Protein backbone atom coordinates (compact mmCIF):
# COMPACT_ATOMS: atom_id res chain seq x y z
CA UNK A 1 0.00 0.00 0.00
CA UNK A 2 1.28 3.46 -0.86
CA UNK A 3 2.47 5.57 2.09
CA UNK A 4 0.10 8.32 3.19
CA UNK A 5 2.19 11.47 3.37
CA UNK A 6 1.48 14.94 4.68
CA UNK A 7 3.37 18.21 5.16
CA UNK A 8 4.03 20.19 8.33
CA UNK A 9 2.28 23.57 8.24
CA UNK A 10 3.00 24.81 11.78
CA UNK A 11 5.10 23.97 14.85
CA UNK A 12 4.20 25.55 18.19
CA UNK A 13 6.35 23.96 20.91
CA UNK A 14 5.32 20.31 21.24
CA UNK A 15 2.21 20.78 19.03
CA UNK A 16 2.60 20.21 15.27
CA UNK A 17 -0.06 20.72 12.56
CA UNK A 18 0.21 18.42 9.52
CA UNK A 19 -1.74 18.90 6.26
CA UNK A 20 -2.74 15.79 4.29
CA UNK A 21 -4.11 15.36 0.74
CA UNK A 22 -7.87 14.97 0.45
CA UNK A 23 -9.15 11.61 1.69
CA UNK A 24 -5.90 10.69 3.42
CA UNK A 25 -6.54 12.20 6.85
CA UNK A 26 -5.19 9.90 9.62
CA UNK A 27 -7.26 8.64 12.55
CA UNK A 28 -7.01 10.15 16.03
CA UNK A 29 -4.13 8.49 17.99
CA UNK A 30 -2.38 7.38 14.77
CA UNK A 31 1.42 7.68 14.96
CA UNK A 32 3.13 9.84 12.31
CA UNK A 33 6.85 9.74 11.53
CA UNK A 34 9.05 12.67 10.57
CA UNK A 35 12.84 12.83 10.19
CA UNK A 36 14.45 15.34 12.55
CA UNK A 37 17.15 16.87 10.36
CA UNK A 38 18.68 18.51 13.42
CA UNK A 39 19.44 15.26 15.31
CA UNK A 40 19.09 12.70 12.51
CA UNK A 41 16.56 10.82 14.67
CA UNK A 42 13.04 9.84 13.72
CA UNK A 43 10.40 11.84 15.60
CA UNK A 44 7.00 10.32 16.40
CA UNK A 45 3.93 12.56 16.41
CA UNK A 46 0.59 11.39 17.80
CA UNK A 47 -2.62 12.72 16.22
CA UNK A 48 -4.81 14.36 18.88
CA UNK A 49 -7.33 16.34 16.81
CA UNK A 50 -8.57 16.62 13.24
CA UNK A 51 -9.11 20.20 12.10
CA UNK A 52 -11.22 20.80 9.03
CA UNK A 53 -10.99 18.41 6.09
CA UNK A 54 -7.25 18.07 5.74
CA UNK A 55 -5.29 19.01 8.89
CA UNK A 56 -4.21 16.82 11.81
CA UNK A 57 -3.08 18.47 15.03
CA UNK A 58 -0.44 16.30 16.71
CA UNK A 59 1.63 16.17 19.89
CA UNK A 60 5.34 15.36 19.54
CA UNK A 61 6.79 12.54 21.66
CA UNK A 62 10.23 14.17 21.71
CA UNK A 63 11.73 17.62 21.24
CA UNK A 64 10.61 19.48 18.09
CA UNK A 65 13.96 21.31 17.78
CA UNK A 66 15.02 21.05 14.14
CA UNK A 67 11.51 20.38 12.77
CA UNK A 68 10.43 22.94 10.15
CA UNK A 69 7.43 23.82 8.03
CA UNK A 70 7.12 21.99 4.73
CA UNK A 71 8.78 18.80 5.98
CA UNK A 72 7.30 15.51 4.83
CA UNK A 73 5.45 13.36 7.38
CA UNK A 74 4.54 9.67 6.92
CA UNK A 75 1.41 8.16 8.46
CA UNK A 76 2.14 4.73 10.00
CA UNK A 77 -1.64 3.96 9.86
CA UNK A 78 -1.57 2.60 13.42
CA UNK A 79 -1.22 3.91 17.00
CA UNK A 80 2.09 3.95 18.88
CA UNK A 81 3.06 0.31 19.50
CA UNK A 82 5.48 -0.92 22.15
CA UNK A 83 7.29 -4.23 22.74
CA UNK A 84 5.69 -6.43 25.41
CA UNK A 85 6.70 -9.71 27.02
CA UNK A 86 9.53 -11.19 29.09
CA UNK A 87 12.14 -9.27 27.08
CA UNK A 88 11.01 -6.06 28.83
CA UNK A 89 11.93 -7.45 32.28
CA UNK A 90 15.18 -6.09 33.68
CA UNK A 91 15.13 -3.34 31.06
CA UNK A 92 14.56 0.42 31.12
CA UNK A 93 12.71 1.93 28.15
CA UNK A 94 11.03 5.18 27.12
CA UNK A 95 7.39 5.55 26.11
CA UNK A 96 8.10 4.19 22.59
CA UNK A 97 9.71 1.04 24.01
CA UNK A 98 13.18 2.25 22.96
CA UNK A 99 15.96 1.29 25.42
CA UNK A 100 17.51 3.97 27.62
CA UNK A 101 19.77 1.60 29.58
CA UNK A 102 22.42 1.19 26.82
CA UNK A 103 21.87 -2.58 26.70
CA UNK A 104 20.75 -2.90 23.07
CA UNK A 105 17.29 -3.01 21.48
CA UNK A 106 14.30 -4.54 23.23
CA UNK A 107 12.85 -7.17 20.90
CA UNK A 108 9.25 -7.72 21.95
CA UNK A 109 7.47 -11.08 21.74
CA UNK A 110 4.62 -8.95 20.40
CA UNK A 111 3.98 -5.26 19.80
CA UNK A 112 0.82 -3.84 21.37
CA UNK A 113 -0.79 -0.41 20.84
CA UNK A 114 -0.68 1.82 23.93
CA UNK A 115 -4.35 2.84 23.47
CA UNK A 116 -6.54 -0.10 24.43
CA UNK A 117 -10.05 -0.62 25.74
CA UNK A 118 -10.47 -1.69 29.36
CA UNK A 119 -11.60 -5.31 29.90
CA UNK A 120 -15.36 -5.75 29.45
CA UNK A 121 -17.51 -6.22 32.55
CA UNK A 122 -17.87 -9.93 31.68
CA UNK A 123 -14.08 -10.37 31.81
CA UNK A 124 -13.59 -8.47 35.06
CA UNK A 125 -13.25 -10.30 38.34
CA UNK A 126 -15.68 -8.95 40.90
CA UNK A 127 -14.49 -11.03 43.85
CA UNK A 128 -12.72 -9.06 46.58
CA UNK A 129 -9.35 -10.39 47.65
CA UNK A 130 -6.65 -8.87 49.83
CA UNK A 131 -3.07 -8.66 48.54
CA UNK A 132 -0.73 -9.48 51.42
CA UNK A 133 2.27 -7.13 51.35
CA UNK A 134 4.15 -8.50 54.37
CA UNK A 135 4.36 -4.93 55.72
CA UNK A 136 2.59 -4.85 59.11
CA UNK A 137 1.24 -1.28 59.17
CA UNK A 138 -0.25 -1.63 55.66
CA UNK A 139 -1.70 -5.13 56.09
CA UNK A 140 -3.31 -4.22 59.42
CA UNK A 141 -4.61 -0.67 58.93
CA UNK A 142 -4.94 -0.12 55.17
CA UNK A 143 -5.04 -3.51 53.41
CA UNK A 144 -4.46 -3.51 49.64
CA UNK A 145 -7.12 -4.99 47.36
CA UNK A 146 -5.83 -7.38 44.67
CA UNK A 147 -6.40 -5.54 41.40
CA UNK A 148 -7.10 -2.28 43.21
CA UNK A 149 -5.56 1.17 43.23
CA UNK A 150 -3.53 2.55 46.10
CA UNK A 151 -2.34 6.13 46.53
CA UNK A 152 0.87 7.05 48.39
CA UNK A 153 0.87 10.64 49.60
CA UNK A 154 4.06 12.09 50.98
CA UNK A 155 6.62 14.84 50.69
CA UNK A 156 10.29 14.52 49.83
CA UNK A 157 12.46 12.24 51.93
CA UNK A 158 9.80 10.41 53.95
CA UNK A 159 10.52 7.03 52.37
CA UNK A 160 8.18 6.68 49.35
CA UNK A 161 10.84 5.10 47.16
CA UNK A 162 12.06 2.65 49.82
CA UNK A 163 8.46 1.56 50.46
CA UNK A 164 7.92 1.15 46.71
CA UNK A 165 11.08 -0.95 46.39
CA UNK A 166 10.12 -3.15 49.37
CA UNK A 167 6.72 -3.79 47.78
CA UNK A 168 8.41 -4.72 44.48
CA UNK A 169 10.75 -7.08 46.36
CA UNK A 170 7.94 -8.73 48.36
CA UNK A 171 5.75 -9.22 45.28
CA UNK A 172 8.68 -10.74 43.37
CA UNK A 173 9.97 -13.02 46.15
CA UNK A 174 6.82 -13.98 48.10
CA UNK A 175 4.18 -13.95 45.34
CA UNK A 176 6.41 -14.65 42.29
CA UNK A 177 4.74 -11.59 40.76
CA UNK A 178 5.94 -9.07 38.22
CA UNK A 179 6.34 -5.34 38.74
CA UNK A 180 6.21 -2.53 36.19
CA UNK A 181 7.49 0.90 37.20
CA UNK A 182 6.44 4.08 35.38
CA UNK A 183 8.56 7.14 36.15
CA UNK A 184 6.38 10.06 35.09
CA UNK A 185 7.82 13.57 35.16
CA UNK A 186 9.98 13.06 38.24
CA UNK A 187 13.68 13.82 38.75
CA UNK A 188 16.07 11.96 36.46
CA UNK A 189 18.48 11.56 39.39
CA UNK A 190 15.81 9.66 41.36
CA UNK A 191 15.17 7.39 38.38
CA UNK A 192 18.88 6.66 38.13
CA UNK A 193 19.10 5.94 41.88
CA UNK A 194 16.14 3.55 41.63
CA UNK A 195 17.71 1.75 38.66
CA UNK A 196 21.02 1.28 40.51
CA UNK A 197 19.37 0.24 43.79
CA UNK A 198 17.19 -2.31 41.99
CA UNK A 199 20.27 -3.89 40.46
CA UNK A 200 21.96 -4.08 43.86
CA UNK A 201 18.92 -5.57 45.64
CA UNK A 202 18.23 -8.11 42.88
CA UNK A 203 14.61 -7.13 42.14
CA UNK A 204 15.45 -5.83 38.65
CA UNK A 205 14.97 -9.25 36.98
CA UNK A 206 11.23 -9.26 37.68
CA UNK A 207 10.68 -5.56 36.91
CA UNK A 208 10.16 -3.55 33.73
CA UNK A 209 10.90 0.19 33.96
CA UNK A 210 9.40 2.87 31.72
CA UNK A 211 10.63 6.43 32.12
CA UNK A 212 9.61 9.86 30.87
CA UNK A 213 11.20 12.25 33.33
CA UNK A 214 11.07 16.01 33.96
CA UNK A 215 13.35 16.83 31.03
CA UNK A 216 11.03 15.15 28.50
CA UNK A 217 8.43 17.08 26.46
CA UNK A 218 4.85 16.95 27.79
CA UNK A 219 3.72 14.54 25.04
CA UNK A 220 6.13 11.89 26.34
CA UNK A 221 5.21 12.42 29.99
CA UNK A 222 1.52 12.18 29.10
CA UNK A 223 1.94 8.78 27.41
CA UNK A 224 4.46 7.02 29.69
CA UNK A 225 1.77 5.61 32.05
CA UNK A 226 -0.06 4.11 29.04
CA UNK A 227 3.11 2.34 27.87
CA UNK A 228 3.72 0.89 31.35
CA UNK A 229 0.07 -0.14 31.58
CA UNK A 230 0.22 -1.88 28.17
CA UNK A 231 3.29 -3.89 29.28
CA UNK A 232 1.37 -4.81 32.48
CA UNK A 233 -1.71 -5.87 30.50
CA UNK A 234 0.37 -8.36 28.49
CA UNK A 235 1.56 -10.09 31.68
CA UNK A 236 -2.00 -10.12 33.05
CA UNK A 237 -3.83 -11.26 29.90
CA UNK A 238 -1.29 -13.52 28.16
CA UNK A 239 0.78 -14.88 31.03
CA UNK A 240 -2.13 -14.75 33.52
CA UNK A 241 0.02 -13.21 36.23
CA UNK A 242 -0.58 -10.80 39.09
CA UNK A 243 1.18 -7.55 38.23
CA UNK A 244 2.11 -4.63 40.46
CA UNK A 245 2.13 -1.32 38.55
CA UNK A 246 3.90 1.64 40.16
CA UNK A 247 3.27 5.14 38.85
CA UNK A 248 5.51 7.88 40.23
CA UNK A 249 4.06 10.49 39.96
CA UNK A 250 0.42 10.51 38.80
CA UNK A 251 0.20 14.30 39.30
CA UNK A 252 2.86 14.81 36.60
CA UNK A 253 0.68 12.86 34.17
CA UNK A 254 -2.12 15.39 34.71
CA UNK A 255 0.37 18.26 34.57
CA UNK A 256 1.68 17.09 31.18
CA UNK A 257 -1.89 16.94 29.85
CA UNK A 258 -2.55 20.50 30.98
CA UNK A 259 0.70 21.71 29.33
CA UNK A 260 -0.43 20.64 25.86
CA UNK A 261 -4.14 21.29 26.36
CA UNK A 262 -4.06 25.04 25.65
CA UNK A 263 -1.76 24.54 22.63
CA UNK A 264 -4.32 22.07 21.26
CA UNK A 265 -6.85 24.91 21.37
CA UNK A 266 -8.91 23.72 24.33
CA UNK A 267 -10.39 26.16 26.82
CA UNK A 268 -8.77 25.64 30.24
CA UNK A 269 -11.05 24.61 33.12
CA UNK A 270 -10.60 25.09 36.90
CA UNK A 271 -7.09 26.18 38.01
CA UNK A 272 -5.93 26.06 34.38
CA UNK A 273 -6.22 22.28 34.03
CA UNK A 274 -7.39 20.64 30.81
CA UNK A 275 -11.19 20.37 30.38
CA UNK A 276 -10.68 16.63 29.71
CA UNK A 277 -9.03 16.02 33.12
CA UNK A 278 -11.64 13.53 34.39
CA UNK A 279 -11.77 11.53 31.14
CA UNK A 280 -7.94 11.47 30.78
CA UNK A 281 -7.67 10.08 34.30
CA UNK A 282 -10.60 7.69 33.74
CA UNK A 283 -9.11 6.22 30.55
CA UNK A 284 -5.94 5.35 32.46
CA UNK A 285 -7.52 4.15 35.72
CA UNK A 286 -10.29 2.04 34.13
CA UNK A 287 -7.68 -0.22 32.51
CA UNK A 288 -6.15 -1.00 35.91
CA UNK A 289 -8.33 -3.89 37.06
CA UNK A 290 -8.54 -7.62 37.81
CA UNK A 291 -9.76 -10.09 35.23
CA UNK A 292 -10.58 -13.76 35.74
CA UNK A 293 -7.04 -14.58 34.53
CA UNK A 294 -4.86 -12.16 36.49
CA UNK A 295 -4.71 -8.76 38.10
CA UNK A 296 -3.03 -5.37 37.88
CA UNK A 297 -2.67 -3.76 41.30
CA UNK A 298 -1.47 -0.21 41.04
CA UNK A 299 0.45 1.88 43.56
CA UNK A 300 0.46 5.55 42.64
CA UNK A 301 2.60 8.21 44.27
CA UNK A 302 0.65 11.45 44.38
CA UNK A 303 2.17 14.90 44.76
CA UNK A 304 -0.28 17.33 46.35
CA UNK A 305 0.39 20.88 45.07
CA UNK A 306 0.80 23.30 47.99
CA UNK A 307 -0.72 20.60 50.28
CA UNK A 308 -4.12 21.49 48.83
CA UNK A 309 -6.15 18.28 48.67
CA UNK A 310 -9.00 20.14 46.93
CA UNK A 311 -6.79 20.86 43.89
CA UNK A 312 -8.49 19.26 40.83
CA UNK A 313 -5.54 16.90 40.12
CA UNK A 314 -5.39 15.02 43.46
CA UNK A 315 -9.18 15.38 43.91
CA UNK A 316 -9.81 13.62 40.56
CA UNK A 317 -7.33 10.87 41.52
CA UNK A 318 -9.04 10.26 44.90
CA UNK A 319 -12.24 9.16 43.18
CA UNK A 320 -10.42 6.12 41.72
CA UNK A 321 -8.46 4.96 44.79
CA UNK A 322 -9.30 2.00 47.03
CA UNK A 323 -6.68 2.78 49.68
CA UNK A 324 -4.78 5.90 50.75
CA UNK A 325 -1.39 5.55 52.44
CA UNK A 326 -0.24 8.79 54.03
CA UNK A 327 3.50 9.04 54.71
CA UNK A 328 4.08 11.51 57.50
CA UNK A 329 7.12 13.66 58.11
CA UNK A 330 6.44 13.49 61.85
CA UNK A 331 6.76 9.69 61.84
CA UNK A 332 10.03 9.81 59.91
CA UNK A 333 11.47 12.46 62.28
CA UNK A 334 10.77 10.09 65.18
CA UNK A 335 12.64 7.35 63.30
CA UNK A 336 9.45 5.30 62.92
CA UNK A 337 9.90 3.61 59.54
CA UNK A 338 7.97 2.89 57.37
CA UNK A 339 6.65 6.41 58.07
CA UNK A 340 3.00 5.46 57.42
CA UNK A 341 0.61 7.64 59.43
CA UNK A 342 -1.65 5.06 61.11
CA UNK A 343 -4.47 7.54 61.74
CA UNK A 344 -4.48 9.17 58.31
CA UNK A 345 -4.18 6.04 56.16
CA UNK A 346 -7.43 4.40 55.09
CA UNK A 347 -8.68 1.54 52.92
CA UNK A 348 -12.10 0.55 51.63
CA UNK A 349 -11.04 -3.04 52.32
CA UNK A 350 -10.98 -2.53 56.10
CA UNK A 351 -14.45 -3.98 56.43
CA UNK A 352 -15.45 -6.98 58.60
CA UNK A 353 -17.11 -8.59 55.56
CA UNK A 354 -13.80 -8.49 53.66
CA UNK A 355 -10.99 -8.93 56.20
CA UNK A 356 -13.00 -10.73 58.90
CA UNK A 357 -14.26 -9.53 62.28
CA UNK A 358 -11.03 -10.33 64.15
CA UNK A 359 -8.81 -8.26 61.83
CA UNK A 360 -11.33 -5.40 61.75
CA UNK A 361 -11.70 -5.25 65.56
CA UNK A 362 -7.93 -5.26 66.17
CA UNK A 363 -7.36 -2.53 63.54
CA UNK A 364 -10.14 -0.33 65.01
CA UNK A 365 -8.81 -0.77 68.54
CA UNK A 366 -5.24 0.04 67.45
CA UNK A 367 -6.52 3.26 65.86
CA UNK A 368 -8.57 4.12 68.97
CA UNK A 369 -5.57 3.67 71.29
CA UNK A 370 -3.31 5.75 69.02
CA UNK A 371 -5.97 8.47 68.71
CA UNK A 372 -6.38 8.63 72.50
CA UNK A 373 -2.58 8.91 72.85
CA UNK A 374 -2.64 11.75 70.31
CA UNK A 375 -5.36 13.53 72.34
CA UNK A 376 -3.33 13.19 75.56
CA UNK A 377 -0.11 14.60 74.05
CA UNK A 378 -0.80 18.18 75.20
CA UNK A 379 -1.53 17.13 78.79
CA UNK A 380 1.63 15.01 78.87
CA UNK A 381 3.71 17.89 77.46
CA UNK A 382 2.41 20.40 80.04
CA UNK A 383 1.80 18.35 83.20
CA UNK A 384 3.76 15.14 82.62
CA UNK A 385 2.59 11.55 82.35
CA UNK A 386 2.26 11.24 86.17
CA UNK A 387 -0.82 13.49 86.15
CA UNK A 388 -2.81 11.07 83.98
CA UNK A 389 -5.31 8.60 85.38
CA UNK A 390 -4.23 4.98 85.75
CA UNK A 391 -6.35 4.01 82.73
CA UNK A 392 -4.89 6.76 80.52
CA UNK A 393 -1.37 5.87 81.60
CA UNK A 394 -1.99 2.29 80.52
CA UNK A 395 -3.30 3.52 77.13
CA UNK A 396 -0.18 5.68 76.65
CA UNK A 397 2.13 2.76 77.48
CA UNK A 398 0.34 0.46 75.05
CA UNK A 399 0.17 3.16 72.35
CA UNK A 400 3.94 3.65 72.56
CA UNK A 401 4.45 -0.10 72.19
CA UNK A 402 2.03 -0.19 69.23
CA UNK A 403 3.85 2.76 67.59
CA UNK A 404 7.14 0.89 67.80
CA UNK A 405 5.63 -2.43 66.75
CA UNK A 406 4.29 -0.74 63.59
CA UNK A 407 7.92 -0.26 62.51
CA UNK A 408 9.59 -2.99 60.50
CA UNK A 409 13.05 -3.64 59.04
CA UNK A 410 12.99 -3.75 55.22
CA UNK A 411 14.96 -6.14 53.04
CA UNK A 412 15.89 -3.37 50.61
CA UNK A 413 17.21 -1.16 53.45
CA UNK A 414 19.35 -3.85 55.13
CA UNK A 415 22.63 -2.25 54.12
CA UNK A 416 21.65 1.12 55.62
CA UNK A 417 20.04 -0.10 58.85
CA UNK A 418 21.97 -3.30 59.68
CA UNK A 419 18.62 -4.89 60.60
CA UNK A 420 17.79 -8.00 58.59
CA UNK A 421 14.54 -7.58 56.61
CA UNK A 422 11.29 -9.17 57.77
CA UNK A 423 8.18 -10.34 55.91
CA UNK A 424 5.22 -10.73 58.30
CA UNK A 425 2.07 -12.71 57.48
CA UNK A 426 -1.28 -11.05 58.18
CA UNK A 427 -2.15 -13.70 60.82
CA UNK A 428 1.07 -12.97 62.76
CA UNK A 429 0.45 -9.22 62.45
CA UNK A 430 -3.07 -9.48 63.91
CA UNK A 431 -1.89 -11.85 66.67
CA UNK A 432 0.93 -9.48 67.68
CA UNK A 433 -1.23 -6.36 67.96
CA UNK A 434 -4.01 -8.30 69.70
CA UNK A 435 -1.59 -9.43 72.41
CA UNK A 436 -0.31 -5.87 72.93
CA UNK A 437 -3.89 -4.55 73.21
CA UNK A 438 -4.75 -7.29 75.72
CA UNK A 439 -1.81 -6.20 77.88
CA UNK A 440 0.12 -9.48 77.60
CA UNK A 441 3.37 -7.61 76.99
CA UNK A 442 2.99 -4.58 79.26
CA UNK A 443 6.07 -5.73 81.19
CA UNK A 444 8.39 -5.69 78.14
CA UNK A 445 10.51 -2.56 77.49
CA UNK A 446 9.29 -0.31 74.65
CA UNK A 447 12.53 -0.68 72.71
CA UNK A 448 11.93 -4.44 72.39
CA UNK A 449 9.10 -3.71 69.93
CA UNK A 450 11.18 -1.44 67.67
CA UNK A 451 12.25 -2.84 64.28
CA UNK A 452 11.10 -6.43 64.76
CA UNK A 453 8.84 -8.68 62.67
CA UNK A 454 6.51 -10.87 64.77
CA UNK A 455 5.59 -10.47 68.46
CA UNK A 456 7.71 -13.56 69.26
CA UNK A 457 10.77 -11.66 68.01
CA UNK A 458 9.90 -8.78 70.36
CA UNK A 459 9.72 -11.19 73.33
CA UNK A 460 13.04 -12.75 72.26
CA UNK A 461 14.63 -9.30 71.93
CA UNK A 462 13.43 -8.35 75.44
CA UNK A 463 14.99 -11.53 76.87
CA UNK A 464 18.34 -10.70 75.26
CA UNK A 465 18.15 -7.15 76.63
CA UNK A 466 17.67 -8.49 80.16
CA UNK A 467 20.58 -10.91 79.97
UniProtKB/Swiss-Prot annotation:
**Keyword Cell membrane on entry:** yes
Give the way it sits in the membrane.
Answer: Peripheral membrane protein
UniProt enzyme class: translocase
UniProt-annotated binding residues for ATP: 154-161
A Gene Ontology molecular function term for this protein is: ATP binding
User: Carries keyword Transmembrane helix?
Assistant: no
Give the UniProt keywords, A-Z: ATP synthesis, ATP-binding, Cell inner membrane, Cell membrane, CF(1), Hydrogen ion transport, Ion transport, Membrane, Nucleotide-binding, Translocase, Transport
- Give the location in the cell: Cell inner membrane
What SUPFAM superfamilies has UniProt attached to this entry? C-terminal domain of alpha and beta subunits of F1 ATP synthase, N-terminal domain of alpha and beta subunits of F1 ATP synthase, P-loop containing nucleoside triphosphate hydrolases
Which cellular component, as a GO term, is one annotated location? plasma membrane
Q: What is its EC number?
A: 7.1.2.2
Catalyzed reaction equations: ATP + H2O + 4 H(+)(in) = ADP + phosphate + 5 H(+)(out)
Instruction: List the Pfam families.
Output: ATP-synt_ab, ATP-synt_ab_N, ATP-synt_VA_C
Checking PROSITE patterns in the record gives:
ATPASE_ALPHA_BETA
The family note in this entry says: Belongs to the ATPase alpha/beta chains family.
Q: What does this protein do?
A: Produces ATP from ADP in the presence of a proton gradient across the membrane. The catalytic sites are hosted primarily by the beta subunits.
The subunit structure is: F-type ATPases have 2 components, CF(1) - the catalytic core - and CF(0) - the membrane proton channel. CF(1) has five subunits: alpha(3), beta(3), gamma(1), delta(1), epsilon(1). CF(0) has three main subunits: a(1), b(2) and c(9-12). The alpha and beta chains form an alternating ring which encloses part of the gamma chain. CF(1) is attached to CF(0) by a central stalk formed by the gamma and epsilon chains, while a peripheral stalk is formed by the delta and b chains.
Q: What is this protein called?
A: ATP synthase subunit beta
Annotated organism of origin: Petrotoga mobilis (strain DSM 10674 / SJ95)
Amino acid sequence: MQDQKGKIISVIGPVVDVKFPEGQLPNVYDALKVKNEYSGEELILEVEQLIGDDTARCVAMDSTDGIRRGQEVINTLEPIKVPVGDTTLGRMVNLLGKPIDEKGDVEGEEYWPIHRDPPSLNEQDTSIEILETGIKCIDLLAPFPRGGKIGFFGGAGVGKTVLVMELIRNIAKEHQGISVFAGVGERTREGNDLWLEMQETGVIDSTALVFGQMNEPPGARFRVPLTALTISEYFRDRQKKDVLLFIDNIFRFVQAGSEVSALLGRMPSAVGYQPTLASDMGQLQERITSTKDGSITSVQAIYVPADDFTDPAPATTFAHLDANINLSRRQSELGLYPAVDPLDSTSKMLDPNVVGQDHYSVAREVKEVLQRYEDLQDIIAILGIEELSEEDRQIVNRARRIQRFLTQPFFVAERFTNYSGKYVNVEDTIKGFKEILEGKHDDLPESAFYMVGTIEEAVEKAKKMNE
